[in-house]
Amino acid sequence: MSIAAGLARPPRCVLVNVLTGEAMECLFNPTQLVEKLQVNWNRLAVPGLSHQVLQFQGTSNRQLAGVEFYLDAFFATQQADASNIMAFRGFLRALTVPPAGTEGVLATAPPRVLVLWPGLLTVECVVASVEFHYRQLAVDGRVLVYTATVTFEEVLDTRVTSEQLRQEVP
C-alpha cells in the first residue's frame, strides 16, 4: 500500500437533491445507521377461535432513523474544498419545503433526496424530520460545531417483492 493510499479519505455518504441534482458530500460519515421497517398485519377475530388470524396488510416504508451528521468548521477548513459547514444546513432545510413555482397537490411537496452510502445502500427518500444541535459557537456567534439528526423515509414508485430484496446486494 502506498503512502498516498494510506492517507486517502474513505468514501463518504452523499446526499443528492433528486429535483435539482445538487449533491452534498458529508464532512464525516455518520458513525452508525439505523434501518427500520415494520410489517403491518390485520388481526382478524374469529368467534370461537383460540387465537387471532393474521392477514398481511403491507410493509411500511423503510426508514433511516436518526442519522447524525457531524459538522466541524475547523476540520472543514483543513479540507481541499474548504466548505462552509452552514451550507449543509441550508441543503437539508431546502429538502423540507416545496420548491418555488410548484402548483398542484402532487408537485407541492419537498424534493426527494438520494442517500448514497458507499458499500451499503442507495435509497431514494424524503426527509421526515431534521433536528440541529449547535454544540460550539464562536465569540462572534458563528457556529463552529453542530450536528444534524435526520430521519429519512424511503419513497417507492413500484411494487417490491421478497425475491427482489433477496437479490439486493450493496
Task: Please give the residue ranges for each predicted region.
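Acidic, Ser/Thr- and Gly-enriched intrinsically disordered low-complexity segments
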Residues: 1-170
